C-alpha cells in the first residue's frame, strides 16, 4: 500500500474556479490541452500568446479568447505558465507587475521556481499541476472521458486557497479522473530531471546505441541490430507499463528471463549506479541547472552539436529505411 496522498474527482471542489478567470500562457503541447480541457469544463479561459505567435490562429480556431501574455494575466485570477522552461523567466518579467495579491501563479514543472529563476511576490499563490503525459494524450483522454495521472504541489499559499485551486484545476483538465499525487516543487523537479537524464532519455538511448554498435561491430547486420536493440524496446516497455517488471518477466520466454536476470546487472553494475548517483547530485546541487542556463545564454552551442551528432548516428538512417519498408500497426 502506498503512502502517497492521491486525489480523485470527489476530492476536488470545482466551484472554487466558478468566479475565476484562468490564463494559459502558451499553446504548445501542454498549453493547448489545458486550455481546451478547461474550456470544456466550463472554466473561463484566456490564452496568452505573443502578437506574432504562430499558435494564435490555432487557439482562435479552437474557439478560445486570445490576448498577449500580459493582457491575459491582467484578466486572470490564476495564471498557468506553460511556455518552455527556458522562456518562462522572460515571460514572468512581462506579467509580474500585473499579478494581484491572492492571484495564483501555476506551473507544470518546478525548474524555475526550485532553482530561483523566478521569484514570485510573497502575496501570490504558487502551485504546480503537472500531467504525467504529453499534451495530446491529456486532451485525447479528456475527450474519451478518461483521465491522465498528474502531480500537485503548493510552493506558497498566502491566500489559504492554493491547494483547493490547484486541485480544482487538475480536475478541470481531467487529471483527477485518473489520480493526482501530492508532491513538492523540489521533489518533482529533481526526480523529473534525474529520470530524464539517467533513465528515460539519456540512459535508454545510450544503452540502445551501445547495444546496436556492439552487434554491428561484431559483424551482424545493422537491420538485425536495430530490431533487437531499438524496435523491440517498445514491446518490452509496454509490458512494464501495463504491469511492472513482473508482468514483463512473466510474458517473455524463459530463456529471455534467465538471460536478463543473470546478465542485466553486468551492464548496469555498481559503476553505473555510481554514475547515476553523480547525475543525481548534479541535479540536487544545481550544477545541471547552472549548466543548462549558461548553455541557453550562450546560444546553445553544445546542445546544437550534440543534437546533430544524434541525428547523424547510423541507427537513425537504418531505422528510417526499415520503418518505410514495413506495414506498422497503429500500436
From Swiss-Prot:
GO molecular function, one term: ketol-acid reductoisomerase activity
Pathway(s): Amino-acid biosynthesis; L-isoleucine biosynthesis; L-isoleucine from 2-oxobutanoate: step 2/4; Amino-acid biosynthesis; L-valine biosynthesis; L-valine from pyruvate: step 2/4
Cytoplasm keyword on record: no
Keyword list, A-Z: Amino-acid biosynthesis, Branched-chain amino acid biosynthesis, Magnesium, Metal-binding, NADP, Oxidoreductase
KARI C-terminal knotted domain mapped to chain residues: 184-329
Residue span(s) of domain KARI N-terminal Rossmann: 4-183
Residues reported to bind substrate: 253
Known cofactor(s): Mg(2+)
Residue numbers annotated as active site: 109
Binding site for Mg(2+) 1: 192, 196
Protein name (record): Ketol-acid reductoisomerase (NADP(+))
Organism: Natronomonas pharaonis (strain ATCC 35678 / DSM 2160 / CIP 103997 / JCM 8858 / NBRC 14720 / NCIMB 2260 / Gabara)
Organism lineage string: Archaea, Methanobacteriati, Methanobacteriota, Stenosarchaea group, Halobacteria
This protein's encoding gene: ilvC
Amino acid at each position: 500500500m502506498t503512502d502517497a496522498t492521491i486525489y480523485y474527482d470527489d476530492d476536488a471542489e470545482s466551484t472554487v474556479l466558478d468566479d475565476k478567470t484562468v490564463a494559459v500562457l502558451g499553446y504548445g503541447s501542454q498549453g493547448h490541452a489545458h486550455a481546451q480541457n478547461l474550456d470544456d469544463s466550463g472554466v473561463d479561459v484566456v490564452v496568452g500568446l505573443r502578437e506574432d505567435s504562430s499558435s494564435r490562429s490555432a487557439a482562435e480556431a479552437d474557439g478560445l479568447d486570445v490576448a498577449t501574455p500580459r493582457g491575459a494575466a491582467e484578466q486572470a485570477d490564476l495564471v498557468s505558465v506553460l511556455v518552455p522552461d527556458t522562456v518562462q523567466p522572460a515571460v514572468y518579467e512581462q506579467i509580474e507587475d500585473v499579478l494581484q495579491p491572492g492571484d495564483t501563479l501555476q506551473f507544470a514543472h518546478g525548474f524555475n521556481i526550485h532553482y530561483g529563476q523566478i521569484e514570485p511576490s510573497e502575496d501570490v499563490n504558487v502551485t504546480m499541476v503537472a500531467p504525467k503525459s504529453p499534451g495530446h494524450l491529456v486532451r485525447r483522454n479528456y475527450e474519451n472521458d478518461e483521465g491522465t495521472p498528474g502531480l500537485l504541489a503548493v510552493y506558497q499559499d498566502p491566500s489559504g486557497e492554493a491547494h483547493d485551486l490547484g486541485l480544482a484545476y487538475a480536475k478541470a483538465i481531467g487529471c483527477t479522473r485518473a489520480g493526482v499525487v501530492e508532491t513538492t516543487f523540489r521533489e518533482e523537479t529533481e526526480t523529473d530531471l534525474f529520470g530524464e537524464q539517467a533513465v528515460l532519455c539519456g540512459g535508454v538511448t545510450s544503452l540502445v546505441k551501445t547495444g546496436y554498435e556492439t552487434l554491428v561491430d561484431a559483424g551482424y547486420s545493422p537491420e538485425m541490430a536495430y530490431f533487437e536493440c531499438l524496435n523491440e524496446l517498445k514491446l518490452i516497455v509496454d509490458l512494464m507499463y501495463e504491469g511492472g517488471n513482473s508482468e514483463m518477466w512473466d510474458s517473455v520466454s524463459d530463456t529471455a528471463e534467465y538471460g536478463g536476470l543473470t546478465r542485466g546487472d553486468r551492464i548496469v553494475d555498481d559503476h553505473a549506479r555510481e554514475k547515476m548517483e553523480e547525475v543525481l547530485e548534479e541535479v540536487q546541487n544545481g550544477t545541471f541547472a547552472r549548466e543548462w542556463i549558461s548553455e541557453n545564454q550562450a546560444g546553445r552551442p553544445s546542445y546544437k552539436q550534440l543534437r546533430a551528432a544524434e541525428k547523424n548516428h547510423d541507427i537513425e538512417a537504418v531505422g528510417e529505411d526499415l520503418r518505410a519498408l514495413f506495414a506498422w500497426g497503429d500500436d
